[in-house]
Swiss-Prot record:
The gene is aspS. The record marks 84 as: Important for tRNA non-discrimination. It comes from Bacillus cereus (strain B4264). Its EC number is 6.1.1.23. Belongs to the class-II aminoacyl-tRNA synthetase family. Type 1 subfamily. This is Aspartate--tRNA(Asp/Asn) ligase.
């Protein structure tokens, strides 16, 4: 078999007159009565191959048997297309290949999905036949971008003198965070490894070990409920460094991300990125990962509401809640009563009891709650919300967390429906000064907002024992267009501070020693100050490639039920394998 001389998408007019050897898949076959045209495809693109009896009867006879997705080896001569046959939409649209020989390397059945960017196959069918789905150019281009992003990050970190170090996949199960995936040990009866949710502890131990600068393209595993932007196994760019301040870490990540954007996406973004404190993000956007590509910020009306004539508002404030509103500029005529009812049902998903609304008209406020506001109150409301005729005002009165969640989500929905979002923008943002702990009323205990190894502000360390809810974290999240790209922090590196953190989280001294004794002991041997960040590679590629689902950025992903439709994993295992592990199954009976 002769060697391939050209990739299909790279045969240009410079090759006219040359004999070329091409290999690829049949994208399309057209029989035009005596002539057969084939679009031959490989990962670089498509080239048109012509089978003409005057050039080769033998090649034409073979071409008559060829169907879509056959794998071919074609030998032929490159010629310029006639003036009326030029296709400027193709890189190879000014030439075609006159076939002299063709060899079918492999035949193909009719494929269950159309191999084209605009395939109409359902996602389940695409995942079952993932190897066919991956043939689509849009999929290849996504993974080419993933490769380019990873390569750029590796090159950047190499110039910054970071070492790429692999950490264990089989490790110890520890509390906090999501559920672990467990792996039974054959050698140690009744004991289990856990697959890592992140390399957090190991990268800190590498800092104890004096490596100073570490990174890893790390596989991580979390047994959690899945969403469109979650997978049970995912990849993160894991970075840790000693002796750097928070500002130094943020500056380095900004330089890295601007290079990624330029090299992998061809987009210039400016640094430094804006910074916003967590409390401000929640107050202004109702989100800890705000999409800043459009306005429509939340406005706190609690002070006004406390003295207004609308009891729903006043009672919410009196009970310790708040009233906030968003002004959808010019949207009054775009939302009917039925549309607003749909918005009301939408905010109820986030815990809101309802959605109050007003439309601003030339002669004043109109809507079901307008009667509760006199002229003075109406003017204050209009002034505070900067409302003018044609605006739609939307209010939620509830607990602070419900107001933030519901209006934050409503803001995003309105931004999309009103086409306020410039999809060409890439708005990076740092969210800083997070709360260190969050209280869970159901569990009646505190949980770490990020993880238990996050350093509090020095002046807040003592609050861990007196008022844990007031302690602030030296933590930072990188946000892009309303998605959390990653999170990081400065780390605790002193045993006494780490023990105070564990105590605030409800760990007894014995539990802390059992779970994290190795880390606590390491802190007694001269641990340097250190910090880092972990960036979600899958999510970053999803945003840069313009995809809407993480599954499109992972070669062989899982479904929302954490199953693989291609291999049918997870699946039962043989009884002999269970016996070897000294395991017995005790399955719940289906109700």
């Amino acid at each position: 078999m002769a060697e391939r001389t050209h990739a299909c998408g790279k045969v240009t007019v410079e090759a006219v007159g040359q004999t070329v050897q091409l290999k690829g898949w049949v994208q399309k076959r057209r029989d035009l009565g005596g002539l057969i045209f084939i679009d031959l495809r490989d990962r670089t693109g498509i080239v048109q191959v012509v089978f003409n009896p005057e050039t080769s009867k033998e090649a034409l006879e073979v071409a008559e048997t060829i169907r879509s997705e056959y794998v071919l080896h074609v030998e032929g001569t490159v010629v310029e297309r006639g003036e009326g046959a030029i296709n400027d939409n193709m890189a190879t649209g000014r030439i075609e290949v006159q076939a002299t020989k063709v060899n079918v390397l492999n035949a193909a059945k009719t494929t269950p999905i159309i191999i084209a960017d605009d395939t109409d196959a359902s996602e389940d069918v695409r995942l079952k036949y993932r190897y066919l789905d991956l043939r689509r150019p849009v999929m290849f281009n996504t993974f080419k971008m993933r490769h380019d992003v990873t390569k750029t990050i590796r090159n950047f970190l190499d110039t910054e003198e970071f070492l790429e170090v692999e950490t264990p996949i089989l490790t110890k199960s520890t509390p906090e965070g999501a559920r672990d995936y467990l792996v039974p040990s054959r050698v140690h009866d009744g004991e289990f490894y856990a697959l890592p949710q992140s390399p957090q502890l190991f990268k800190q131990l590498l800092m104890v070990g004096g490596f100073e600068r570490y990174y890893q393209v790390a596989r991580c595993f979390r047994d959690e409920d899945l969403r469109a932007d979650r997978q049970p196994e995912f990849t993160q760019i894991d970075i840790e460094a000693s002796f750097l301040t928070q500002d130094e870490i943020l500056d380095m990540m900004e330089r890295m991300m601007t290079k990624v954007m330029k090299d992998a996406k061809g987009v210039e973004v400016s640094a430094p990125f804006p910074r916003m404190k967590y409390a401000d993000a929640m107050a202004r956007y109702g989100s800890d990962k705000p999409d800043t590509r459009f306005e429509m910020e939340l406005t706190d009306l609690s002070e006004f509401a406390a003295g207004c004539g609308f009891k729903v508002f006043t009672s919410a404030v009196e009970s310790g809640g708040q009233v906030k509103a968003i002004n959808a500029k010019g949207a009054a005529s775009k939302y009917s009563r039925k549309d607003i009812d749909a918005l009301t049902e939408f905010v109820k998903v986030y815990g809101a009891k309802g959605l109050a609304w007003l439309k601003v008209e030339e002669d004043g406020l109109k809507g079901p709650i307008a009667k509760f506001f006199g002229e003075e109150d109406a003017n204050v409301l209009m002034s505070t919300l900067e409302a003018t005729a044609g605006d739609l005002l939307l209010f939620v009165a509830d607990k602070k967390s419900v107001v933030a969640d519901s209006l934050g989500a409503l803001r995003l929905r309105l931004g999309k429906e009103l086409e306020l979002i410039d999809e060409s923008k890439f708005n990076f943002l740092w969210v800083t000064d997070w709360p260190l702990l969050e209280y869970d009323e159901d569990a009646d205990r505190y949980f770490a907002a990020h993880h238990p190894f996050t350093m509090p502000f020095r002046e807040d360390v003592e609050l861990l024992e007196t008022a844990p809810e007031k302690a602030r974290a030296q933590a930072y999240d990188l946000v892009l267009n309303g998605y959390e790209l990653g999170g990081g922090s400065l780390r605790i590196y002193e045993r006494d501070v780490q023990e105070k953190m564990f105590k605030a989280l409800g760990f007894s001294q014995e539990e802390a020693q059992e779970q994290f004794g190795f880390l606590l002991e390491a802190f007694e041997y001269g641990t340097p100050p250190h910090g880092g960040i972990a960036l979600g590679l899958d999510r970053l590629v999803m945003l840069l490639a313009g995809r809407t689902n993480l599954r499109d950025t992972i070669a062989f992903p899982k479904t929302a039920s954490a199953s693989c439709l291609l291999t049918e994993a997870p699946s039962p295992v043989a009884e002999a394998q269970l016996e070897e592990l000294n395991l017995k199954l005790s399955l719940k009976e289906e109700k």
